[in-house]
Amino acid sequence: MSGFANTVYADLVGQDQVIEILQNAVATTRAETEPINYSIHGMTHAWLFTGPPGSGRSNAAIAFAQALICPNNGCGSCKECKSAANGAHPDVEIVRTEGLSIKVDEVRELLSRVAWAPAMGGWRVVVMEDADRLTESAANALLKAIEEPGNRTVWLLCAPTLHDVLPTIRSRCRHLQLVTPSTDAVAQVLQTRDGISATMANFAARVSQGHIGRARYLATNETVRNSRSTIMKLPLTLQGISSAFAAAQTLIDLATQQATEAAETRNEKELDDLSLAYGKGATGRGMATGGSKAIKDLAKEQKTRQTRMIRDGLDSALLDIATFYRDVMLVQAGAHDALVNKELENEINTMAEKTKPQATIKKINAIMVARTNLGHNAAPLLTVEALMCNLAR
């Protein structure tokens, strides 16, 4: 990674091959004449970044956007790079959905915004962080724009896997697959860039399994570490139906608490800003036209966002629990040296002795099914209760 220090790619851990492709694409644009010939050089009008959670697919897309509009090919320090990263550059649109899906009306509104030529004379870049959340009608609306792009418009789509994006869209994109960084690489980044102790960095990197954002969050937040500790002990409490329901409620409570705390400050600031814009303190006729509706719309948006945050929190918790059973399976296979949860080694060994590998595999599969169901908008409490009952068997 040393070769990419002090550039927009500095935070992409273990993605050297992807970075080199992006750097080459940016370099070819500097020598291009109008119109851009996408068929010959490394640049193209649509890119699809895929990779597991924590691989940095969104960070890679945003870094590429910065490099395209940067006069120095992505220095990371100029005003263009900084404004693009913050979503404040007029030619860089970063689409982040706060809800469970991206609807067709949102895509149509986006298309109307990006239809104009670049304001600064370079590129107009659209980063869509959650392309996998496009509804079918929204994806079809986006397809037309990708099929007939402006000469200086670049689409950067992000999704966990190729199969999370419609075939008609992915076939028109250049695909870049990011990988999960090694735990050693993540630990090194936490130490050198965040000043975290070696012990804490190694722990956070190990239990996050290479998810650098999650690792940093764990390493710097004691409350999050305590919540994870509670979650990791839940499998040990599953002795029957009543304990399964209690464990499910604990998961729901923890996810709700974390989502509420994370959203509280942001929600308050958004409401204050909106109230100020429409005449703070005024009511009824004293409030600017549309103010009441805007506040109601904001409340609805915030509720949707919190719902997604709860689901994301549950998904993260289920992944953590899956690592417990993964460790049990490794011990049952005789591999004691590759445990994720070394702090629970005694408990893992005990469960490995009491259960069979086939049962462990079924439990891991049940967790993955529950995660899929949550992603498909299943009721969180019922989904988690059913899962805990399966794990208690």
Task: State each model region's role.
Residues 1-66, 83, 152, 160-317, ...:
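Charged, glycine-rich active-site and insertion segments that engage polyanionic ligands
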Residues 23-25, 34-38, 104-125, 133, ...:
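Conserved alpha-helical scaffold flanking the Walker A/P-loop in AAA+ ATPase domains
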Residues 42-43, 85-89, 119-122, 136, ...:
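Short loop/turn elements that form and flank the Walker-type P-loop nucleotide-binding site
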Residues 65-76, 150:
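Post-Walker A helix-loop "phosphate-sensing" segment adjacent to the P-loop in P-loop NTPases
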Residues 74-103, 164-165:
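AAA+/P-loop NTPase substrate/partner-engagement loops
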Residues 115, 140-157, 167:
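Conserved catalytic/switch belt of AAA+ P-loop NTPases
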Residues 126, 156-159:
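Conserved D-loop beta-strand region of ABC ATPase nucleotide-binding domains
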Residues 130-134, 162:
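Conserved Walker B
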